[in-house]
């Protein structure tokens, strides 16, 4: 029965991927958005069994200029905690790529990633947001929030383009959302966790220490970045596709003044948007959860269509079983780059690491990769168990997988 469900889920996933398409026309393709959405649907579950949480718009945001790209109000989904979790808060920052040109930001205004007019009115809470103890053993009864992403720069911008009526106000959205949640009871939090997936995982890194400053010293505050370890890596043509993309984001949204000053004193602003140059300087305890062969980075950073003009990587990046030995070695070099980048970070006793050798993305939001009977494991522990062990100081977690293809527990993504 389990295999039937997995096959059915895969068929649904492939169909939805084709239907959604991509943001093309030479701009940043929102593959991150697609993967995040599609992964949440991988487990075939009846809608009646899912916790559906309504959207709340932040009414006070408008007067502060804390608005989405198109000027609409930002929003979040909150499911209140209960029992022992009544004064515990988990904030999940939504992912969804970036816009790196005026044109791509204008397009983004017509989607839920740039306008609350297009956001779903209810969202399913699964994985780390689930309210079931058998699906989310450590955080199921916490106050759980999903903060919607509509600024295109991982909640960091504070400028605008008047001629195009674009509002780059991610930093203001962050502040406005935190003020609202504090007024909703988060100021009484005994424990708090800031998490995020993909572009939201990067945002969790960028805002981690700011999040800590919201609470008194008696509150336990930690951060989780899921699939947020975007690497300044060489692509298959020898160039730096992701650096070019990030440079566009930093320039278009004028992020220079919003980035870590400790970093920008030594490196250029674009380098200070890459987590590898930030994580070791974060003072708040943090957990890095990442697939060593991150599916989004394989698709859009290592072998994007713009540099694979011959299409020689198309089959390989769609399904790693179609890769030749030299292509696999290219991925192994990328894994080594990532592992080396977290070595200093991992030396801190307060930090946690879970890097599995899978072709995956956003493993905390999906139920089948977060906590399920056949979930991916490292050292005999699921992602959920590992994050819980780290957060509650049950044990240290420094789990780095052996290279592909040694891990047989992966839920790898395959594109058609």
From Swiss-Prot:
Subcellular location field? Secreted, Cell wall
Q: Which domain of life is it from?
A: Eukaryota
Where does the record say carbohydrate is attached?
131, 324
Cellular component per GO, a single term: extracellular region
Question: Where does the secretion signal sit in this chain?
Answer: 1-25
Task: Provide the primary localization.
Answer: secreted
Biological process terms from the Gene Ontology for this record are: cell wall organization
Q: Which family does it belong to?
A: Belongs to the pectinacetylesterase family.
Q: What is this protein called?
A: Pectin acetylesterase 3
Q: Give the source species.
A: Arabidopsis thaliana (Mouse-ear cress)
Which gene underlies this protein? Answer: PAE3
């Amino acid at each position: 029965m389990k295999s039937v469900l997995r096959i059915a889920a895969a068929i649904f996933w492939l169909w939805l991927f084709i239907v959604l398409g991509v943001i093309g026309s030479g701009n940043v393709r929102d593959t991150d958005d697609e993967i995040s959405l599609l992964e949440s649907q991988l487990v075939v579950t009846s809608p009646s069994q899912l916790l559906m949480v309504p959207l709340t718009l932040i009414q006070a945001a408008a007067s502060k200029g804390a608005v989405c790209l198109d000027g609409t109000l930002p929003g979040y989904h909150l499911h209140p905690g209960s029992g022992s979790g009544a004064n515990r808060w988990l904030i999940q920052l939504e992912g969804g790529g970036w816009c790196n040109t005026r044109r791509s930001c204008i397009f983004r205004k017509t989607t839920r990633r740039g306008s609350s007019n297009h956001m779903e009115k209810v969202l399913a809470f699964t994985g780390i947001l689930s309210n079931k103890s058998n699906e989310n053993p450590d955080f199921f009864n916490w106050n759980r929030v999903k903060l919607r992403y509509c600024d295109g720069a991982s909640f960091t911008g504070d400028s605008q383009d008047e001629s195009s009526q674009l509002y780059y106000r991610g930093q203001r959205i962050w502040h406005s959302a935190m003020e609202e949640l504090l007024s909703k009871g988060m100021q009484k939090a005994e424990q708090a966790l800031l998490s995020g997936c993909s572009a939201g995982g990067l945002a969790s890194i960028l805002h981690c220490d700011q999040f800590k400053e919201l609470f008194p010293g008696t509150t336990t505050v930690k951060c989780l970045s899921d699939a947020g370890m975007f690497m300044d890596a060489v692509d298959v043509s020898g160039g730096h596709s992701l650096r070019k993309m990030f440079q566009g984001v930093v320039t278009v949204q004028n992020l220079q003044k919003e980035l870590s000053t400790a970093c920008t004193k030594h490196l250029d602003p674009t380098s200070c948007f890459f987590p590898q140059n930030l994580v070791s300087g974060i003072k708040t305890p943090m957990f890095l959860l990442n697939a060593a062969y991150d599916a989004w980075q394989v698709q859009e950073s290592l072998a994007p269509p713009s540099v694979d003009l011959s299409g020689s990587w198309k089959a390989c990046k769609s399904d790693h079983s179609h890769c030749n030995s030299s292509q696999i070695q290219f991925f192994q070099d990328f894994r080594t780059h990532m592992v080396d980048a977290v070595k200093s970070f991992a030396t801190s006793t307060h930090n946690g690491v879970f890097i599995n050798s899978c072709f995956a993305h956003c493993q905390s939001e999906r139920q089948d990769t977060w906590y399920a009977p056949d979930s991916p494991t490292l050292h005999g522990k699921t992602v959920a168990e590992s994050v819980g062990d780290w957060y509650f100081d049950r044990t240290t977690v420094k789990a780095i997988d052996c290279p592909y293809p040694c891990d047989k527990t992966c839920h790898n993504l395959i594109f058609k």
